[in-house]
Amino acid sequence: MAKIDDNIKQKIKTLNREELEKLLIKAATKHKEFHDYLLVNYIDKEFGEKELFERAKSDLNVLFYKSYKGFSEQLRLANMLSACIKRINEFAKVCKNKNLEADLIMCVLEVPFSYSTNMFGTCFTAFDYKVGLRVKRMITLVTKKMHEDYLIDYKEKINKYLDILHRTSGHIDFIYAFPKKID
């Protein structure tokens, strides 16, 4: 992020309302993140986050069906997970609602865990590692960044995912260090 020097700050303070409006509109049209920030914080405070959530969810659905490079199905899924997390990070920068972020992550995690458990534990450990990263992020969100009442909503699925990862990918140190379950 660029640091704004004092000279620019002084010039902005001297701009009239019309010039400020032009500047805001130009910035919002050039930068999607700034547009979304304006939407959530100023234009539609009540439904802005939900609208961004629905847009992010539909973007994720498009990413699920896109074809990715990779020698095996596991590597293609690992690339898909990277693309999905990139989209979730864009959402999380603008929307500070951790519950919606957790819902998006759970939506992404349903894809690799909908396959057979034979997909895990192969020589293509990039897939196992990327799935493990997503599960770890979900655990961190639920246990540290959200209110503890939300743990009830996600606990069952997270524990199921942890069980599968420990059974199939326990040979990876990163996954071996995960808790057996969360309470």
Where are these regions (language model features)?
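N-terminal interaction modules that seed assembly of large macromolecular complexes
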Residues: 2-69
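Charged linear interaction tracts used for macromolecular binding and regulation
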Residues: 60-144
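Short coil/turn residues that cap or connect secondary-structure elements
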Residues: 16-19, 120, 146, 150
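Surface-exposed polar/charged interaction patches
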Residues: 15, 30, 66, 91-94, ...
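Eukaryote-biased recognition of C-terminal alpha-helical segments
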Residues: 127-183
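Sequence-level detector for tyrosine residue identity
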Residues: 34-37, 42, 65-68, 115, ...
